[in-house]
Amino acid sequence: MARATFDMNAAGLEARGGGHTEHGPLPFSVESLLEAERVPGSESGELGVERPLGASKPGAWPPPVAHSCPPRAPSPPPCTLRKHKTNRKPRTPFTTAQLLALERKFHQKQYLSIAERAEFSSSLSLTETQVKIWFQNRRAKAKRLQEAELEKLKLAAKPLLPAAFALPFPLGTQLHSSAATFGGNAVPGILAGPVAAYGMYYLS
């Protein structure tokens, strides 16, 4: 009785399944995992090819290109021009009264002795070094002015005509020699008048 019931159940299952039974792979079986890892192919039906991990996906941005910086131009050599000294002492600002006293003293005497310089600097509330340097600069200025005046005198003393047009001897000597050569006759040109007058004065 039990065997007949089992046969009927088996026959019913076969009738429902079309005469045979198929069982699909379980969701956690090895076949299902392998099917999930496969990559679908392209539209032409080709199977997908597995790409390495570092490969870029289709349609992604290309990797940035590293731009090499241009070489820097060499720095110019340091300037070798002579620079003014920064530790130079500032010029002494003399007052108007001090300058007038220094000028009067310079016109009296251009060179001061040590005692005179000490006394004079003390009267002006200046140091001996300041008075000494002022007299040195004033003497140099006086020398430049004197040389400029001499140059002006030399330029003023030069003749207006060049040396080629200067007469080698006085005009009277030339006229006397011309009259003696031609026997008192008049010479054509500019010598006619003076020679004739000279001859008439000599004959009278």
Curated annotation (Swiss-Prot):
GO terms for molecular function: DNA binding; DNA-binding transcription factor activity, RNA polymerase II-specific; histone acetyltransferase binding; histone acetyltransferase regulator activity. It comes from Mus musculus. The keyword Transcription regulation applies. Acts as a potent transcriptional repressor of MSX1. The lineage of its organism: Eukaryota, Metazoa, Chordata, Craniata, Vertebrata. InterPro entries: HD (IPR001356), HD_metazoa (IPR020479), Homeobox_CS (IPR017970), Homeodomain-like_sf (IPR009057), HTH_motif (IPR000047), Msh_Homeobox_Regulators (IPR050674). Coiled coil: none annotated. CDD domains: homeodomain. The keyword Repressor applies. Residues 87-146 bind DNA. This is Homeobox protein MSX-3. Residues 60-79 have a biased composition (Pro residues). It comes from the Eukaryota. Belongs to the Msh homeobox family. One of its GO terms (cellular component) is nucleus. One of its GO terms (biological process) is negative regulation of transcription by RNA polymerase II.
